[in-house]
Structures are given as structure tokens and as C-alpha cells.
């Protein structure tokens, strides 16, 4: 088993200087490079045009420390196809161009989700119409970025907490077969992209949602549906990092080729929690990478809980230094 050197945690509280500018952060080698040295594919974060242009510190940190980018909002349905058949890609183009020009892998997020869905989609009641709309959306978005996206979150948050399938417009109108339709369409458009199913609250082995994900994915794989990976968002409360290892092992048992932590943030950003999560991925062979859901606390969707690796002044926090010192 690969283990972070937990003794390095002691260094965090013995005079760590966390108030220096970004260009004098402690890590002389990026945390992405350190993570890759353990055989993983990336340690990444998110971005979009607003956060990449609001100041110079945010993009500087991304360039220096992270190896992968996920668009926070610009590839979601409401951003890319607000009206039927009328696509707009200015925001997602900006993110993709930034990532490619700086040598970052890209995770496409997300093709099919019940939220941030335009009303014209959610109001469709005819099965054949919705299937046509679903296929066209996936095909158009993926075609634009074919060959540029490492992995796509094809389906996002389709499970209820009890492990059953959510009553979204896609499930209610098409039925469970929308899962097959979505993944087969995605595979036909870009055969080289990794295709993921992504969800939250997959953070504890034995939890009903984890069990539901595993059992459904096993069934879908047996039916030939081309699911390459399971994404665990991993939005954690304080102290929850220790359960992630067991959860990843459970998800890996579903039989996909890979799994990933896709939207990591942790209330309070304790060093112990972050190290536990990084260890969990290191110790699970199928876990290819971690995406932290934001660079600095002010831009976090849960900013009041200070869940990220950089503070309001874009200085590295103790959790960042825990990872940098221990990898």
C-alpha cells in the first residue's frame, strides 16, 4: 500500500508560513507532479472564464500546481444549449483553450443532469422527442471537443439516497434505458474518451447509495453499456475523510476500468482529512486522479465552510502543505 508520510503532518504546525505570495509557496514541485510520481494520472481543479480572469493569482496557481481542469458550469446543458438546437460554446471554449495551452487534462462536465437543465428540456413529455434531444445534445457537445477531453461525466447525480434511480425527466419519460442511450451515444462520438457516471454521497462503504451505484453499474456493464469509470464527487463534512478509502474500494468492485474523486472539498479543510482522501486514492489501483472543486475559498460553492486548499488571499493552507510535504 502507498502511504503518505503521516509524520510530515507534524511539520504543518511548527512554523509553516502560509502568508507568502503564490510564487513562494512551499512546494518547489507541484502537488500534481508529486501525485503523478505515485503512478496516478492527475491532481486537478476546476475553472471557468470568470475564475480564470478575475485575478492573476487563480490562473497562476492552476498553472503551477494542478494537472487537470474541469469546467465548473460552462459545459452544463443550460450553458451549452439554452434553446433547442441553439448551441453556445464561448465559456467552454475559453476553458478548453486555457487548459490545452497550459498542458492540462480536461474532464468534461456534464452531459446529462437533472439540474441546470433548461425548461424546454424538462417539459418534454414525448419519449421519442426526448431521445432525439438527448442524442443530439451529447453528439453536438462531444463532437466540438472530440480528442480534447480525457473523460466525460456522461451522467451526473442520477441516484436517490436509497440507491434507486432519480425521477428525472429522462427517467420518467424514457425509462432506465436512457442510461444505455446516453453512454452508447457518447462512445460513438468519441471512442477514446473515458465515460463516467458521477454522483455525490458515495463517501462511505455500505451506504445505500454506494450499494445502489455498484449494483446498477454491474448490471449495466453486464449488458454491454460502455461505462469506463465511476466518479465520486466527495463533498465532505469535517472528519469524514477517513471513510473514503472503504468507499473507493466498494466503488472499484463495480467493475469499471477506473474510478476518480471528481469534486473534492472538505468543510474546514483539515490536513488529516485531505491526507486521508489522497491516501485513499493512492491505495486504490483503479483511482486515477483527484479533482479539487475550486482553488481558493472565495470561489467555492460552499465558501462559508472554507473547504479548499488555498485561503481568501490565495495563500496555501495547512492542508495544501500536508499534501505537498507528504507525497
UniProtKB/Swiss-Prot annotation:
InterPro entries: GH10, GH10_AS, GH10_dom, Glycoside_hydrolase_SF. GO terms for molecular function: endo-1,4-beta-xylanase activity. It comes from Penicillium canescens. Its EC number is 3.2.1.8. Pfam families: Glyco_hydro_10. The active site is at residues 157, 263. Induction: Nucleotide sequences for binding catabolite repression protein CREA were detected in the promoter region. It is an enzyme of class 3 (hydrolase). This is Endo-1,4-beta-xylanase A. GO terms for biological process: xylan catabolic process. Endo-1,4-beta-xylanase involved in the hydrolysis of xylan, a major structural heterogeneous polysaccharide found in plant biomass representing the second most abundant polysaccharide in the biosphere, after cellulose. SUPFAM superfamilies: (Trans)glycosidases (SSF51445). Gene3D superfamilies: Glycosidases. Transmembrane segments: none annotated. Pathway: Glycan degradation; xylan degradation.
